[in-house]
C-alpha cells in the first residue's frame, strides 16, 4: 500500500535478513504529514524480500544522505509518488498505472506462480483470504492446468484409466 511504502524508515528494512517490517502508514491531512497505524491489524507484518530488491534498497539507502533511522526513506507525498509514476509511464510510452496497480500485479503474479491464497494474504496484509480470492478471475486457465496436473499425476503412478 502507498501509505505503508511512504512510512518506511531505515529501521524498518533489514537488508541482511532481507525483510521489511510494516508497522505504520503515512498520510497527509490539512498539509501535515501523519504517521499512523496501518490499515488493519493484519497489515502489520514482516515481508521477506527477494535478493535483488534487498540489494536495490541497500544501494538506495547508501546513496541517500546519512538518514536518521527514524526518517522516512521516501520523503514525498502520495500525490508526488503517483505523479512521478504517471510521468514515467508517459515517457516510456506505456499505459498509465497507479501505485495500487503494482500491488494488484504483484498479487496476480504470485497467484500465477502457484502460491496459496493464505500465503499471499499474509504477504499483502489482507485482513481476510477472501480479499485475495478477488484476484482469482485473472487466471481462467487455472482449471485446465489443475486437470492437466491431475492427469500427469495419475499417469505417472500408472493409474490412468484406459478404454
Please place each PLM-identified region on the residue numbering.
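Basic, Lys/Arg- and aromatic-enriched nucleic-acid-binding interface segment
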Residues: 1-2, 6-8, 16, 52-55, ...
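Short, charged phosphate-coordinating catalytic segments
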Residues: 1-26, 118
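Mobile genetic element proteins and their domesticated derivatives, centered on retroelements
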Residues: 5, 22, 49, 85, ...
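C-terminal secondary-structure termini that scaffold catalytic or DNA-interacting sites
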Residues: 17, 30-32, 36-44, 51-53, ...
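Active-site/catalytic core of tyrosine-dependent DNA strand-transfer enzymes
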Residues: 17, 25-28, 50-95
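Catalytic-site neighborhood detector that most strongly recognizes the C-terminal catalytic loop/helix
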Residues: 26, 54, 117, 124-149
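Short basic/aromatic active-site micro-motif
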Residues: 76-79, 95-114
